[in-house]
Amino acid sequence: MVILETPRVFLIASWGSEAVISAFTDALYRGVPWEEAVKAQAPDVIIKRISAFYRQGHWSVFEFMGAQFLVECSRACHTQFIRHRMASYWSESQRYVDYTKREIRFVVPKGFPADLLKRAYEDYARLREGFRPEYARMILPNATAVLFAVQMNARELLLNFAPLRCAYAAQAEIRHVCWQMFAHAWRLWPNLARLVWEDLPSLHRDFCTKVPRGEDCRLYAIKDAEEKHGPLPETPWLSALVHG
């Protein structure tokens, strides 16, 4: 039995890029042959075009970029996550996985009573003596870790998922997951991610709900998530705060 405080997010693969979106602009609107369009994307041109698409609300072009992640979080967090339907999922099944033969994991915030989790697993093990995993699983708590694959395009991740799940109003665990994904997005699509970072407090009307007046809603949400679930592996937005 393993008890984790920090949910985990692994970047598996990605598709598309800001350079590809910029190249599509030349190919579709200027008649430039694709091979030439791909080679002609200067960094300043890419920044200008990504910013223009974003500011003008032409967000559908960002669906041509996306990523695949492997996420490990609690069953409670997993249930919240898969409500975002503009994504593809493949999840660990408690119906078929036998946790008496495979290590069981739990994801809980700091200070959660470990003895309760130990007792739950012992009850599960006793049930497995007479029942299949699909019945024994009913005793497992929402803290039980679930490993799942998710595929999401950049528009869904940065302009729908992030404004909802990176906010302080979201539960700390899924918020921690969201900020980990945001950090990966920053490396993949730096110009779009920076634009979204700047506008996050205004992209959803409830983003700053419950945040004390005068606090930066983003940093307040991050600090609280880290206090409950440990430090984030990457924080690329700090450079944006320093350099403006």
UniProtKB/Swiss-Prot annotation:
GO terms for MF: flavin adenine dinucleotide binding; NADPH binding; thymidylate synthase (FAD) activity; thymidylate synthase activity
Residues bound to dUMP: Q80, F81, I82, R83, S93, Q94, R95, R137, R165
Binding locations of FAD: S60, R83, H84, R85, N153, A154, R155, N160
Reaction catalyzed: dUMP + (6R)-5,10-methylene-5,6,7,8-tetrahydrofolate + NADPH + H(+) = dTMP + (6S)-5,6,7,8-tetrahydrofolate + NADP(+)
Domain of life: Archaea
Needed cofactors: FAD
PROSITE patterns: THYX
Cofactor binding: number and manner: Binds 4 FAD per tetramer. Each FAD binding site is formed by three monomers.
Keyword annotations from UniProtKB, A to Z: FAD, Flavoprotein, Methyltransferase, NADP, Nucleotide biosynthesis, Transferase
UniProt xrefs under InterPro entries: Thymidylate_synthase_ThyX, Thymidylate_synthase_ThyX_sf
This enzyme's EC code(s): 2.1.1.148
GO biological process: dTMP biosynthetic process; dTTP biosynthetic process; methylation
Catalytic residues (positions): R165
Disulfide bonds listed in the record: none
Motif (ThyX motif): 83-93
The protein's enzyme class: transferase
Gene3D superfamilies recorded: 3.30.1360.170
Metabolic or biological pathway: Pyrimidine metabolism; dTTP biosynthesis
ThyX domain sequence ranges: 7-199
NCBIfam families: thyX
Similarity-based family: Belongs to the thymidylate synthase ThyX family.
Biological role: Catalyzes the reductive methylation of 2'-deoxyuridine-5'-monophosphate (dUMP) to 2'-deoxythymidine-5'-monophosphate (dTMP) while utilizing 5,10-methylenetetrahydrofolate (mTHF) as the methyl donor, and NADPH and FADH(2) as the reductant.
Assembly description: Homotetramer.
Protein name: Flavin-dependent thymidylate synthase
UniProt organism field: Pyrobaculum aerophilum (strain ATCC 51768 / DSM 7523 / JCM 9630 / CIP 104966 / NBRC 100827 / IM2)
